Amino acid sequence: MINDIRRINITTSSIESLNENSKYLKRNHKRTIKICAYAITTFALFFIVVVYFKNQTNVNDANRNTLAAIDETSLMNKEIAYLREILKKYKTKTNENNEYAYEKNDDINGDGEDEHELLLMLHKFLKNKGNPNKIDRFDINNNDSNKNRGNENIDQINILSQKLESMHDNIKYASKFFKYMKEYNKKYKNIDEQLVRFENFKTNYMKVKKHNEMVGKNGITYVQKVNQFSDFSKEELDSYFKKLLPIPHNLKTKHVVPLKTHLDDNKIKPKEGVLDYPEQRDYREWNILLPPKDQGMCGSCWAFASVGNYEALFAKKYSILPISFSEQQVVDCSSDNFGCDGGHPFLSFLYFLNNGVCFGDNYEYKAHDDFFCLSYRCAYRSKLKKIGNAYPYELIMSLNEVGPITVNVGVSDEFVLYSGGIFDGTCASELNHSVLLVGYGKVKRSLVFEDSHTNVDSNLIKNYKENIKDSDDDYLYYWIIRNSWSSTWGEGGYIRIKRNKLGDDVFCGIGIDVFFPIL
């Protein structure tokens, strides 16, 4: 042990060298710690900086989006504010010509709920109409958008300008549309359907206005107005007026009695000529007609015409006030007809012949088909003996010797919009509607709107008289027809249609299909 110790030669210089090495190792250790600390600090600072700038970018984007949203909201608010201002101004316009009730907005005034709905509907309408492709808003991060931003902004300004220019007219039509909805109790599923109906209404309204400006010119002797069909499209109207069912020849041969045979059987001697009969005949003055009924959205005109004919002749025969009989019974129970999908008055009379018809109170009208025939409800059934018919040249004779008769007509868009006067417009080429012929007459052209049943605006009558020429003040001949579209349509539910002096010109198809019940 001692020898080993002796082998170690320890000097002062060796000890100093060892001390230096120890210090060097300590310094390296501290340097490593510092480097690690600096690295960690640098990484932390870098991370903080990255996070900061990322957050700042998100904040900028959010602010930009917020500003854009605020800009869009401001634009919408400006539009709505403009609409409100126009609505207020429009309400004060009371000096415009009043073609009919929709020129004034009294019902809209003060109705906050309706005004809000009006603005909502119109705002959506204007956005869809003025910008159908939904032009995207300007995006500052989109290079393509940046490149064309000037053009896009100009386009958007032009679009907005066009919107603002058309707002006055649209707010005017929209306010009329809301009054129309109230009057006819129109209910729509959603705002999209309401917009479609608004467009249909606006089209028909402009058509009516254009027609009424021409009344008195070019021989036009009737006026139009919007009614329960004015929110229909042309396709819907064509679908509503269905072609009348054909009559099997064998049934017609078996059950129909010609007019002259019927008169001979009842020992009635008719006049020798049509001109021997009175110049006027109006069964509205005889107290044998009920007020015009309303078939609604059911294609049951054939039932209303035939039942109305039966009611009138029943009252005339027994000299009593008219009693209402059941259209719904015929709609549900007449298997030869197709209910609300169409029929024919002859087939309706054939049902009366075999089964009778009950009072309306026992079998009330629903304006739709029932799955079952509920004729057990009928406490009393009145039958007829035979079915009569007449030729076109016998219409005036029929009205005088029999009474009201059922005829079929060809209804057109112009016919539907009729409001008053003597209709001389275009008719459909096919018979598609059944009505009750209740009289005929004649009138001087200048006095067309002086009829007691006419309720035409005085301004229209004034314009009509200014437009006709004194040299053209001849006599006009017409039929009086009761429709089944309620008493709000036409002249209290009636229409006057032009005819020639003898009544055999079959205008609008009147005279082609003529039937009446023989009690």
UniProtKB/Swiss-Prot annotation:
Topology of this chain in the membrane: Single-pass type II membrane protein
* Recorded phenotype for the gene knockout or disruption: During mosquito A.stephensi infection, number of oocysts and salivary gland sporozoites, and sporozoite gliding motility are normal. However, development of blood stage parasitemia is delayed in C57BL/6 and Swiss Webster mice intravenously injected with knockout sporozoites. Parasitemia initially increases but then plateaus for a few days to rise again more rapidly and mice die between days 14 and 19 post-infection with high parasitemia. Preferentially infects host reticulocytes.
- Name the residues annotated as catalytic in the UniProt entry: 301, 433, 483
Q: Which protein are we looking at?
A: Berghepain-1
Q: Which domain of life is it from?
A: Eukaryota
Protein family (similarity comment): Belongs to the peptidase C1 family.
Uppermost EC category = hydrolase
Cysteine disulfide links:
298-340, 333-373, 358-378, 427-508
Q: What is its EC number?
A: 3.4.22.-
The alphabetical list of record keywords is: Disulfide bond, Glycoprotein, Hydrolase, Membrane, Protease, Signal-anchor, Thiol protease, Transmembrane, Transmembrane helix, Zymogen
Glycosylation sites per record: 55, 143, 432
Asked whether the keyword Repeat is assigned, the reply is no
Under the heading CDD domains, the entry gives: Peptidase_C1A
Q: Which GO terms describe its molecular function?
A: cysteine-type peptidase activity
- UniProt function note: Cysteine protease. Required for host hepatocyte-derived merozoite infectivity and to a lesser extent for host erythrocyte-derived merozoite infectivity.
Q: What is its main location?
A: membrane
Name a single GO cellular component.
Answer: membrane
Q: Which residues lie on this side of the membrane: Lumenal?
A: 54-519
Q: Which GO terms describe its biological process?
A: entry into host cell by a symbiont-containing vacuole; proteolysis
Q: Could you tell me where this protein is found in the cell?
A: Membrane
